């Protein structure tokens, strides 16, 4: 088949050259072969799929030196001024087999919170939506009817952070007076006792990954008091306290290989062994507070056993035994993780980002500069190939998720960009800003897809449901908005 495609293209007297396919990790596919210089991505797709010999042909994108082959190989080679006397390496990348469409309209404006909405989060399958607010409540919203479902009262101060367990059965919330509460989304009732111990407010929450423990028993919290605590949610007690940071811990990630990562205003990131709390290494390099960080595997960890490609119109709870869920979560994690360990990206008040391989090395892989103001949030795309960073400089920047190389700036907001969220297929990005708008960006085209005005004031929180159906946003106007295509 591959030979037939190449033969067919050989008719006519066109300049030809030798090319070699390889995957992102540098693994060669087949031997070098000869193609016409004007070969198109469609033809490359046929050849590459024939070599891969998959049952179902995969949608693929092709690159030469980071530049995508869009119209023909020749045009890309010209733009990159590549030596064509040598073998040209073409990198192939499988693309998501499903496609998320950009949201275009607000379908509901949900009132209920009496103060600003500080956080919004969809559950791992997209079945439930939760929000945390300055009015001290957590609210669950019914997505089939887009109406308020439960109002959860228990906190006595602003709810600053919320996080879903990866099985979607519990939501943890942390507040300004240092307490962590757990909620059942199907009843709106508190689960177990209030987890107390932190002396200052909660800055982040992160659950043990589903593939490590399908019971979703442990959750970690970070606080302005400089510590990280790991809680046993079944027993309702603190399992261990990780101390070592000298200032506020700003964010926290529970990785998929048994490590916990904490970032702090003391300018460091600490890597801990989750099961016994031993400090493995300290990552240094930032010149100011570390505000935000993300893992290359975040999306797989967040969604656990849920596969966005198999989403149905009405989101359901996950079905299957704990063993089956664990296996599904494990295979999804390993697919995104790839051969090397998970990567971490951190963003700081010093306007820079660093890319790390924290399981192996305390030196950064790359220092990423270009933002003109502090960085609010950084996120890897679900397929881990691109890093997006949102900043007070009004821009969102895109970077290569493996090398940290700068790719593009997305401009359009007229004030600080607070939060961003990826669509499950890694093709779109939504951003919420102090300018009161949301914007949806086409990442490949590096341009604005849709502009979503509607909020009356700053937008603090935004999330895109893992099933791709909805975007939720909240902010200073106390309103929760749901956007659909």
Swiss-Prot record:
Residues the record lists as Phosphoserine modifications: 79
Ranges: WD repeats: 112-151, 154-193, 197-241, 244-282, 327-366, 370-409, 412-451, 454-484
GO cellular component: nucleolus; nucleoplasm
PROSITE patterns: WD_REPEATS_1, WD_REPEATS_2, WD_REPEATS_REGION
Main location group: nucleus
Tissues with expression: Highest expression in heart, brain, lung, liver, skeletal muscle and testis with lower levels in spleen and kidney.
Any Gene Ontology biological process: inner cell mass cell differentiation
Pfam families: NLE, WD40
Phenotype seen when the gene is deleted: Embryonic lethality prior to 6.5 dpc with death of inner mass cells. Embryos implant but die shortly after.
Compartments reported by the entry: Nucleus, Nucleolus
Keyword Protein transport: no
Modified residues (N-acetylalanine): 2
Protein name, as recorded: Notchless protein homolog 1
Name of encoding gene: Nle1
């Amino acid at each position: 088949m591959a030979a037939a495609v190449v033969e067919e293209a050989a008719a006519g007297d066109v300049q030809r050259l030798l090319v070699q396919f390889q995957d992102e990790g540098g693994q060669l596919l087949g031997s070098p072969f000869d193609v016409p210089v004007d070969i198109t991505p469609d033809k490359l797709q046929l050849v590459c799929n024939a070599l891969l010999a998959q049952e179902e042909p995969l949608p693929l994108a092709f690159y030469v030196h980071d530049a995508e082959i869009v119209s023909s190989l020749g045009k890309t080679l010209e733009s990159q001024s590549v030596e064509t006397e040598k073998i040209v390496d073409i990198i192939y990348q499988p693309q998501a087999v499903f496609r998320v469409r950009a949201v275009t309209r607000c379908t509901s404006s949900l009132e209920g919170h009496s103060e600003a909405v500080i956080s919004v989060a969809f559950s791992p399958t997209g079945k439930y939506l939760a929000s945390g607010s300055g009015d001290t409540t957590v609210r669950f919203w019914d997505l089939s009817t887009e109406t308020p479902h439960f109002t959860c009262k228990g906190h006595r101060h602003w709810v600053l952070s919320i996080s879903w367990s990866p099985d979607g059965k519990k939501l943890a919330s942390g507040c300004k007076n240092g307490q962590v509460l757990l909620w059942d989304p199907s009843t709106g009732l508190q689960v177990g006792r209030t987890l107390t111990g932190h002396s200052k407010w909660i800055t982040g929450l992160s659950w043990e990954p589903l593939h490590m423990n399908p019971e979703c028993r442990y959750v970690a919290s970070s606080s302005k008091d400089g510590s990280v605590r790991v809680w046993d949610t079944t027993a309702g007690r603190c399992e261990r306290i990780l101390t070592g940071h000298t200032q506020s811990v700003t964010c926290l990630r529970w990785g998929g290989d048994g490590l916990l990562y904490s970032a702090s205003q003391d300018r460091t990131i600490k890597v801990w062994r989750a099961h016994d709390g031993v400090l493995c290494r300290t990552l240094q390099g930032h010149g100011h507070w570390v505000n935000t960080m993300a893992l290359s595997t975040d999306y797989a960890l967040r969604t656990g056993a849920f596969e966005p490609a198999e989403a149905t119109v009405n989101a359901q709870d996950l079905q299957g035994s704990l063993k089956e869920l664990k296996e599904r979560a494990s295979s999804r994690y390993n697919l995104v993780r790839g051969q090397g360990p998970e990567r971490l990206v951190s963003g700081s008040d010093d306007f820079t980002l660093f890319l790390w391989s924290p399981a192996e090395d305390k030196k950064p892989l790359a220092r990423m500069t270009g933002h003109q103001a502090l960085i609010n949030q950084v996120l890897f795309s679900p397929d881990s190939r691109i890093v997006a960073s949102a900043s007070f400089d009004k821009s969102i920047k895109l970077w290569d998720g493996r090398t940290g190389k700068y790719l593009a700036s997305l401009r359009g907001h007229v004030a600080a960009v607070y939060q961003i969220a990826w669509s499950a297929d890694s093709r779109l990005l939504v951003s919420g800003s102090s300018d009161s708008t949301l914007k949806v960006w086409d990442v490949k085209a590096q341009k604005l897809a849709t502009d979503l005005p509607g909020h009356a004031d700053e937008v603090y929180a935004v999330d895109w449901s893992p099933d791709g159906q909805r975007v939720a946003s909240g902010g200073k106007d106390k309103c929760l908005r749901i956007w659909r295509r």
